[in-house]
A protein has these predicted regions:
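Ribonuclease/tRNase effector modules and their secretory precursors
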Residues: 2-130
């Protein structure tokens, strides 16, 4: 069955999409010594209708690329357990992240904990504009 543009546009992201996004992110962040990980909660929230407009694959790919280009080195300076919120003002996307050292691995984990589309998101954590 061929999907209409509207069906394609409103389609939820699935496990394959997240696997592709993680591979895309890892290809970029690997040189910074970071392994990008999406939590189950993050994946659930991407498809949450409370975000208003659905968070699209392209938005996530753009967010990851902009994060790498604009803030990759800033993220590497976060301490073990350090938290921050990636904020993309153009799309109102907010992504709380945590950096975790892995003693048995050469890379640290950059854990994307959740995502929400909210204009005036407030946090006590460091905000990183991307």
């Amino acid at each position: 069955m061929i999907k209409t543009f509207s069906q394609w546009l409103n389609e939820e992201l699935d496990a394959r999409d997240f696997k592709d996004l993680e591979r895309f992110a890892d290809d970029h962040f690997e040189e910074l010594g970071l392994d990008v990980v999406f939590t189950k909660h993050f994946k659930d929230q991407v498809n949450n209708p409370r975000n208003g407009a659905a968070v699209t694959y392209d938005e996530l790919e753009n967010l990851l690329l902009r994060t790498y280009n604009a803030a990759g080195h800033k993220i590497t300076k976060l301490p073990d357990g350090g938290e921050a919120v990636l904020k993309q003002l153009a799309t109102w996307l907010n992504v709380p992240v945590k950096v975790i050292d892995q003693p048995d691995q050469p890379e640290r984990e950059l854990v994307l904990k959740t995502i929400m589309r909210k204009r005036h998101f407030e946090t006590p954590n460091q905000e990183i504009l991307v």
